[in-house]
Amino acid sequence: MSEEYVTLKINGEEKNAAGKTIYAYLSEEGYDTSRVVVEQNLQIIPQDQLENTLIQEGDQIEILCFVGGG
């Protein structure tokens, strides 16, 4: 079974990614999904919807990571 790839922008950089959920993409890229906020096409995606929100052709996604420290 071949994967269908879509072109999108993530943090301003053009990427090709298999059509998958945002959660799957974040996990594959090594993001701690409990410490990120994701915006898809100017809409913030609630944490409980990351597993059900598909990446679509032409999406613009911003990933913001929170880091603690002092």
Locate each region found by the language model.
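Ubiquitin-like/PB1-type beta-grasp interaction modules and other compact soluble beta-rich domains
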Residues: M1-G69
